[in-house]
Amino acid sequence: MVWDVFVSYRHQAPDGPWVRGVLVPRLQEAGLAVFVDVDSFRLGMPLVLEMARGVEQSRHTLAVLSPAYLTSNFTELESVLAEHLGLEASERRLLAVMREPCRPRLGIRARLWLDMTTDEEVARNLPRLVEELRAPSGVVS
């Protein structure tokens, strides 16, 4: 794998600015290789192929959950691709953080996610997220 994590998020505010201005820099400061679309998608390539490349070449996909995330077909595709790869390899590929309260689809609700709805929760849970992202995808038992 080339990347530690592919970040799946909505570009619109407040999600995009928080991901690009807070989350990604802090993950990179922790030494993680982060695949984020605005920096890693190749110009001129079809978006769907670049999404698939990001998911396939990353050990984990991190879904940044919010009401806006749930309305996007693109973010749904990214999370479904990660779930599918995880099922194929019996690995834990899809992780999630809750940025804004929302009710994700069942496949994501069935997973434990980290609360990052406030600055205090970000400070408390970011070290755990970094630790999880550093760990191998791992076989699900």
Residue ranges and their predicted role:
Residues 1-64, 83-92, 99, 120-141:
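Conserved N-terminal substructure of TIR/SEFIR domains
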Residues 14-16, 43, 71-74, 105:
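Secondary-structure boundary/capping motif
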Residues 67-88:
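Conserved TIR/SEFIR loop-to-helix hotspot centered on a Trp-containing motif
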Residues 86-87, 104-106:
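Short secondary-structure boundary/capping segments
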Residues 94-96, 113-115:
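Conserved beta-strand scaffold positions in the cores of enzyme catalytic domains, especially
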Residues 98-104:
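Short, polar loop motifs at secondary-structure junctions
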Residues 107, 116:
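Residues that scaffold the ATP/ADP-binding catalytic core of kinase and kinase-like folds
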Residues 109-111:
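Eukaryotic intrinsically disordered, low-complexity regulatory regions enriched in Ser/Thr/Pro
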